[in-house]
Amino acid sequence: MMIRILIYLTLTFTLFSCQSADKKAVDFYLEQANSYKAKITRDIWGVPHIYGETDADAAFGLAYAHAEDDFINTAENFYLYRAQMGLKEGASGAIQDYLIKVLKIRERIELNYLTDIDEEVRKVIEAYAAGINYWMIQNPNNEYSQFFPVTEQDIVAGFSIQNLFFSGVMSSIEKLQREENIKEEYTSLYRNQELVTGSNVLAVNSNKTSDNSTRIIINSHQPLDGPLAWYEAHIRSDEGWNMMGGLFPGSPFVFVGFNENIAWGFTVNKPDLSDSYLLEINPDNNNQYLLDGSWTDFEIETIKLPTKIFGPIKWTFKREAKYSVHGPVLEIADKHYALRFSGMSDIKQVNQWFAMNKSNSLEEWKSAMKMRSIISFNGVYADKEDNILFLHNSSSPKRSEGIDWKNVIDGTKSDLIWNSYVDFDEIPQIINPSSGWIASTNQDPFKVTDSKDNLDSSNYSPTLGLQTRMTNRAYRSIELFDEYKEVDEDTFDLIKFDNKYSKQSRSYKYIAKIFEMQFDTEELNFAQAILKEWNLGTDLNNTSAALGVCVLSNEWISEQGQRIPQNPEISFKECVKELTATYGKVNPLWSDRNFIARGGEKTSVQGGPDVLRAIYGRNDDEGDLNAAGGDGLYIHVSWNENGDQDSKSIHQYGSATQDMSSKHYDDQVQLYVDEKYKSTFFEKKDLAINTSKVYYVPE
């Protein structure tokens, strides 16, 4: 009886204490929220236009508006940002937490937040976190209440972790994977990320346009759903922040977009930003490695991994982590490899993103890019002064010449450990080519404009590890800009929505091998004829696209994964079998095969993998392809010869990305499939007559 009483008193006291603590926290964060004031104007498409007197006010409003439309993906990110995937997914999630903790991401943020993050940026980040917390207070029954309160460190961690995927640590691991049977904990974080399928940014100036305008189409390809899907918003303050464009859940800054003076977009590039070093271990002491002739102690730490075992039962596992002077150490097949990669201790990405958001000229934007905390991406820029620019942004290590850095490096010599980046002026960039056009589509940085304006690759060190791949989108861009001697608004959009494959592309060359093959069945001979007559388009009425895209997809997926594709004959036979089983024939209309699904409805859509109208589909339960990545939010911005701006955009779904009860859940789908745009209502006068709702937060 006494034990029961003690248990009851303990539980009662604990519950009372928790409730008291929760109320104190709520009161504290409500008081914090009341220090901000933001005006949210929803346009007729539901897109939020946020205004605040200060940048911090605007960031607070942005966080609240985004949470209204998509709190789920913002909150889901916090499992990863806090290295708590183990508490969500058990052992598989703990493996992801291990890598984040080995890389000391949260540790560095907590240690260096006040010194590394600029004060004006801290104010914005802290206001953004306060906006999320205010939404959570207003919606206390949400299923992610365990993340309350969100902190500024959570926000910075998101930027650092995203930088991780592009920094090269995963490339280092992939290099080792080709040599050894690598442990799961070193690859699971990479394999659990959505595939980023590429991007397009096209820019033209008065040297190419028929009306002396300057134009840019920003067309980043992301997953259409999830934590890396685009959200459209407009942020404006009286402190000079006036950006509209795309951002990810949990971001207070626009990643791709425009203001009244400039616009930019990014595409993924793949410079070699990482290295793996093979260490020599002391045979008498496994905790020492050889460096410059001397045995050197590893730095050793214990990593704690809280993990869900079953239901509410949790357990904290402990793992050892080793570090050399090169970086974190992986033990693989009785060998020790140290990793070194660009940005490995940098948490300043937020400073650079904010500087870009506040830029208003070419020089200001370039100054932001010179910060080098964003370690990769191709940047394409345009402005009202008729400037266009291509930048192969790369925080490339300053490496010793004469060494093949694609291979594993000798870890016993300290002179092979690089400690700085090549100068900004030494990375590829083109400003105002005489051709008047730039097309960045994840390709060779020396083939982004007319041949007479392209850079000479021989002027760049091989230690930069610059990519040489060409995409179909790159070939088609070059062909189309060559075909159209002058470009106007409609022609520029025609190029953007082109849905054909080039005969120069890897995809076509892969398929063409099938043309000369001999088959012994009527079914395969008929399918071969269908493939031969394909005009390489992916328009809705095309009857060869289903077979063609099916076959070439194997090559494209293999290239993305840096694998050798299977024999095209095997792909061909597999596709004939798949299409026949699904449609009863190998030549269904592309409109019967390729869809975008939303709100229980499927709508046919043109485009396909690696065409400029990029649609990356996944098979659904019926065997059809449903768009999962590619064209999402895209934006067309222009300035006429007088500097007057026009802008239009479209989102694959609508602004209310998670609210199925809202008309804005899917109200842009039809425009999307019709390859049309909506106005952005960026100008105050346009927004004033196209407003659906105005409200203030806090109320």
Model-derived regions: residue spans:
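C-terminal/peripheral segments of proteins
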Residues: 20-509, 513, 517-520, 533-699
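C-terminal motif of bacterial Sec signal peptides marking the signal peptidase cleavage site
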Residues: 16-17
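Sec-dependent signal peptide recognition
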Residues: 2-9
